[in-house]
Design a protein with these regions (language model features):
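N-terminal secretory/targeting leader peptides
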Residues: 2, 16, 34-121, 137-332
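Signature of the catalytic double-stranded beta-helix
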Residues: 125-138
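Cleavable N-terminal signal peptides
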Residues: 20-21, 31
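Bacterial N-terminal signal peptides that target proteins for export
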Residues: 2-19
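Sec/Tat signal peptide C-region and signal peptidase I cleavage site
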Residues: 26-33
Length: 332
């Protein structure tokens, strides 16, 4: 058989063309390999105040993160009930969640310390407080990325009047962060998911609840609320938590992009919280919610009790880490 010899230049040219064509075909695949899609859940009903900052974060990530990171936002408690989201996050059913330490306290009780902090969150980042907490959280499969709510205090809301810091005889809805404080005030404590509080108030299952200065109008609770106790106590902790393995699996550019988005949401939410809290407190008065104010001595003791109760619970649950967290999170 006769062999046909091609000029070397033609062979080289054909090989180069083949390589170029292959590279062109692989470009979209390479781009896809660098983009990750994350599944996200929200502990709060879509569109409500405590959901909206996270929803803005999701939108910004999806708008600016094409080719790097995208988020598939599957919704709020209707998708996965609030109290089941911590387990879903830890197991990898979802990759990130807008939630609170209160809802993962069974996994990482030390995380509740963020509510008792008296240092600004920016300082807690700088002084190693967040890194210290994240070491504990990562041991339980979680990673704390960013706060989506700050500069907002909690209050006790009631449908029965009191004239001193004594809740004896009252049934109060709690989250884990309030349990010891409210118990020391004499309350009978009841724990329910936020979506069940309106019905509990309506049926007399509870006489009041602990909640931040913002948010009761979204949930309709103002209809069943007559009083708010001042002063406020603790500081709202609401943030974005990751599944630790998923966070570790991201590429450096992906993590850098998400951290940039996290810094944006922390800055915007912290600024908005100050004005939004003032607006909501004013609105509460306008719809007839009366303010209960204690005298100076009672107010001082009330706040001291709140801090002592909170930190005592942390140190009891975590004798090794509680004192160090208090040192890092509490102002001198």
């Amino acid at each position: 058989m006769e062999h046909i010899r091609l000029p070397l230049s033609r062979v080289a040219g054909s090989a180069a063309a083949l390589l170029a064509a292959t590279a062109t075909l692989l470009l979209p695949l390479a781009a896809q390999a660098q983009e990750v899609t994350l599944r996200a859940i929200n502990s709060f009903q879509e569109g409500t105040y405590f959901a909206r900052q996270f929803e803005a974060f999701v939108k910004k990530v999806n708008d600016e993160g094409k080719g790097i990171v995208q988020i598939n936002y599957i919704g709020g408690p209707k998708a996965i009930p609030t109290m089941e989201q911590g387990a879903a996050l830890r197991s990898g059913v979802v990759d990130l969640a807008n939630t609170t330490a209160a809802y993962i306290a069974n996994l990482v009780p030390e995380a509740l310390a963020l509510n008792y902090a008296t240092r600004p969150f920016s300082e807690i980042r700088k002084n190693g407080g967040l890194d210290y907490l994240n070491k504990l959280m990562q041991e339980k499969g979680l990673y704390y990325l960013a706060k989506t709510g700050d500069n907002i205090q909690y209050h006790i809301y009631l449908n029965k009047k009191v004239d001193k810091p004594d809740l004896s005889g009252l049934k109060i809805r709690i989250a884990p962060i309030f349990r010891d404080f409210f118990t020391q005030l004499g309350a009978t404590v009841v724990q329910t998911a936020p979506g069940e509080v309106y019905t509990a108030l309506d049926r007399g299952v509870v006489d009041g609840y602990g909640w931040p200065a913002i948010g009761i109008f979204d949930l309709g609770w103002h209809e069943k609320t007559k009083y708010r106790i001042d002063p406020g106590f603790y500081t709202l902790e609401l943030g974005i938590q990751f599944n630790a393995k998923k966070w570790a699996s991201l590429t450096p550019p992906q993590r850098a992009f998400i951290e940039k988005m996290a810094a944006w949401v922390e800055e915007t939410s912290a600024a908005a919280s100050i004005t939004d809290a003032a607006t909501d407190l004013k609105k509460q008065g306008e719809v007839g919610i009366e303010t209960i104010k204690f005298n100076d001595a009672q107010a001082a003791q009330y706040l001291k009790t709140s801090q002592d109760a909170g930190w005592a619970a942390i140190e009891k649950a975590s004798p090794t880490h509680g004192p160090k967290l208090r040192e890092l999170l509490s102002a001198k």
